[in-house]
């Protein structure tokens, strides 16, 4: 599934918790989601062949939207890194709401020598919320 997340200084800081349809709707503001779906299918096919009989387990692929040089358009960077392990994206997916539950933000901060996971309910819905507020 999709995980829309934010980082600060190359460190994961939080995720949007919403249904897959809502996340696709959110991303459609920035990119053509049919391209995202095609990229996901291609990566799935390629990794299935590459990892056959070599790895069984969870994995996550970090993608990113990047500004195209000289324009205000965004493009998909299809593979920043592949994590052959459980990721914070898996945690976000397991905490994502059903279509009948409110959308949330999951954030992680570090204070007083410990990490803290927090869930914030969105009253106005994900599509009206800036990802920058994570």
Model-derived segments and their meaning:
Residues 1-45, 83-109:
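ATP-dependent carboxylate/phosphate-activation module, predominantly the ATP-grasp catalytic core
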Residues 3, 62-64, 133:
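Residues in well-ordered beta-strands of folded domains
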Residues 13-74, 113-128:
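A long amphipathic alpha-helix within ATP-dependent nucleotide-binding catalytic cores
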Residues 64, 82-83:
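Active-site capping/gating regions of soluble enzymes
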Residues 73-75, 84-134:
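C-terminal active-site "lid" helix and adjoining low-complexity regulatory extension at the edge
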């Amino acid at each position: 599934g999709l995980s829309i997340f934010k980082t600060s200084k190359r460190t994961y800081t939080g995720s949007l918790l919403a249904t897959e349809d809502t996340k696709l709707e959110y991303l459609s503001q920035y990119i053509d989601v049919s391209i995202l779906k095609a990229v996901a299918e291609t990566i799935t096919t390629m990794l299935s062949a590459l990892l056959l009989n070599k790895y069984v387990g969870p994995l996550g692929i970090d993608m990113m939207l990047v500004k195209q040089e000289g324009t205000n358009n965004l493009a998909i960077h299809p593979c920043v890194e592949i994590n052959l392990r459980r990721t914070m994206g898996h945690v976000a997916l397991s905490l994502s709401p059903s279509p009948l539950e409110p959308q949330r933000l999951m954030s992680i901060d570090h204070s007083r020598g410990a990490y803290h996971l927090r869930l914030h309910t969105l009253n106005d819905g994900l599509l009206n919320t800036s990802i920058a507020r994570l």
